[in-house]
Amino acid sequence: MSNKIKNHKLVHGCKIGHATVVSNRIEKPGHAVPGYTMNPTSITIHNVGDDDVPGVNWYNALRSANLDGWRTASWHVTVDYNKIYQSVAFNRVAWHAGDGKNGKGNRHSIGIEHCQYSKDKEKQRKVWENSAALCVELMKEYPVIDLAHIVQHYFWTRKDCPYLLRHKRFGYDWTWYKKLVTDEQQSVQKPTTDKFTPYVVRIIVDELNIRTGPSISYEKVGELKKGDAYTIIEENNNWGKLKSGTGWISLGSKYVEKV
């Protein structure tokens, strides 16, 4: 399971790769988003088709199309070099694969659109790195999806997409991208050499926020009160995971003390 996906939605404000997630405006059924449920079994990689258009523009365009019907295409996520925008829940169908109303691409694949920066290698590299990190989170959340089930839009309809990878822009091709996903997956699965020993901390401030992950960028899910003691079972960047499974708290010396 991924701690960055909750109820088939990315956690708003969390970090994936170089990007901050924007997921506080999930589309309801409309002209572009059909509202059918699905069990995702693959991920489809797209390019948006226009250079230097920021992800927020595509995010807003999908909202506009869903409301007024000027276009029926839809997709789950737009990846930019600094933001990841989710528009459709991962357990809902989006019209992105072009293989028809009942095609496996449309009905069972998570569609990821990627911003294009054909003249900016650094931005484009970050887009692909963010995408690889996102794919790993999706693979953790939906174990049926493995590396073989991350496919190009071309796989479904023979459309020349994702264009930049298919045409090796900046030397980045499909083989390179799949290795990027593999490397990201291995980095998050790397076993720790030291066994962690749980310990107890006492809260020394009036209220201490509990968050879904080890950073203030994660969603707040509760509070702990001054004087109470809790067991920490994992550490990450001076944050501690609560034994209860509720979430993470800061381990800063002005917030907690070891018992």
Task: Describe the predicted segments one by one.
Residues 1-26, 32-37, 115-197, 259:
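Basic/polar, cationic surfaces and motifs that engage anionic cell-wall
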Residues 221-258:
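SH3/SH3-like beta-barrel superfamily modules
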Residues 1-105:
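N-terminal catalytic cores of peptidoglycan-degrading enzymes
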Residues 48-49, 105-106, 110-120, 136:
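Cell-envelope and extracellular/periplasmic
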Residues 187-209, 223-226, 235-236, 257-259:
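SH3-family beta-barrel domains
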Residues 214-219:
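Short alpha-helix capping/helix-loop boundary micro-motifs
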Residues 49-53, 82-85, 90-95, 116-120, ...:
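Solvent-exposed loop/turn segments at secondary-structure junctions
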